[in-house]
Amino acid sequence: RKETVIATKFGIVDESFFMGNEDALNSSRTSILQQVDASLKRLGTDYIDLYYQHRIDPKAEPEEVAETMQELIKAGKIRSWGVSFAPEDYIRRAHAVCKISAIENMYSFVARQDEETYFPLCEELGITYVSACPLAKGYLSNRYPAGTQYRKGDWRAEMNLFKKEGIDANRNLMDLIMEFAGRKRATPAQIALAWEITKKP
């Protein structure tokens, strides 16, 4: 166990959240305590190394969530905590109560806006930045050309990135990635990941 790092999440209590149901968000103290115990049982471990708040619950103040994280750390149930897709003000307020170890946001070759916002914030506060979807949901693998037919319910069918206009807009970037991949005898996904791990923080 000491050689394994386990990260998991709390805050989304029902999959209907992904269909627009915000009532499926619950980061109340009572719910978090139930969620962490359920995670520990499912994972077959007595502590979690990194416990992310999966999405911000508008009904829960950041200070309250951070206090609960502090409680879990003191109880030995988690070692550290992080937040996913949280605004800067939320991060600052929560961090002031209980140190946030990691934030997770969308970041890739085609989503670089955090370089001007969250990267400086992480450096200022000493927080690790974790990329969500470093391959842009598979787009940077170059396996989904224009005209690809997706199964019913596949979210890629609704994303501009995977539609003709998105593919056309990023054509020069993908051509460059493919050129580097050819030189290095690597896949485009490997090039995208190699680029990303050179970034900071």
Residue ranges of model-derived segments:
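N-terminal binding-site loop/beta-alpha segment at the start of enzyme catalytic domains
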Residues: 1-8
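Helix C-cap/helix->beta junction micro-motif
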Residues: 2, 75-76, 125, 184
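Conserved, mostly hydrophobic/aromatic
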Residues: 6, 39, 48, 61, ...
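Glycine-rich beta-alpha junction loops
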Residues: 10-12, 87, 107-111, 133-140, ...
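Glycine/proline-rich, positively charged
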Residues: 15-113, 117
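Conserved short secondary-structure transition element at the edge of the structured enzyme core
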Residues: 73, 134, 163-201
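Glycine-enriched alpha-helix->loop->beta-strand junction motifs that scaffold or abut catalytic
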Residues: 77, 95-102, 121-130, 200-201
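Aromatic-lined glycan-binding groove of carbohydrate-active enzymes
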Residues: 114-154, 187
